[in-house]
Amino acid sequence: VTGIKMNIYLVRHTKPDVDAGVCYGLTDIDVADSFEAELCLLKDKIAHISQPLVFSSPLKRCSKLAEQLAAHLDATHVKTDVRLSELNFGDWELQNWADIPQGVVEEWTDDHIKQAPPNGESYIDLHHRAKQFFEELKSNQEGRHALVVTHAGVIRALVAEAMNLPLREACKVEVGYGSVTRIIIEDGVTQVAFVNR
């Protein structure tokens, strides 16, 4: 089939209600007080998307945003998917980075793609589940546009997947709060139109 085009808009959640320097990933942190202002900016960025399929991480910093954006775009409902959750930092969740022994953190940062924090998951684990979601989305919803509200780790993994980048390189991609990244799939070819807008 020719001419089938699908746009996938990856939206990072807005600023979370957490102090600077705190390690968080899978912890279900709420949105910050700036949510309404950030939401207004995002609504402008995505106003042109008509009735997309909307998917979200189940964490409230994403699902709250997804519900608002879905209503704004006349989307029927939001489908949450656990595979869109942020990296699980295990025992480090909600600890100050400064309080985690430096040697342990350095060991992890040297190979955080394959190494997992204690009782957490590695970036390869995250990439595996994000890729699985992406492949399903492409095959099941061909030709439909999708809005995916998720986390920086997942967005970087999906950009890596779309561009065939090594995961270590993907970690250099800047993904700001409330930013939009657009992936186009046309006639089976995947391209990244823009990142972090």
Regions found by a protein language model. Name each.
Residues 8, 52, 144-153:
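Generic beta-sheet signal
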Residues 10-65, 117-131:
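Loop-to-helix element that buttresses phosphate recognition and phosphoryl-transfer chemistry
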Residues 2-6, 75, 79, 87-99, ...:
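Acidic, low-complexity terminal tails and accessory targeting/binding regions
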Residues 5-14, 100-107:
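Short coil-to-beta-strand
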Residues 68, 157-161:
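Active-site signature of alpha/beta-hydrolase-fold catalytic machinery across serine-
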Residues 16, 154-155:
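Short active-site segment of divalent metal-dependent hydrolases/proteases
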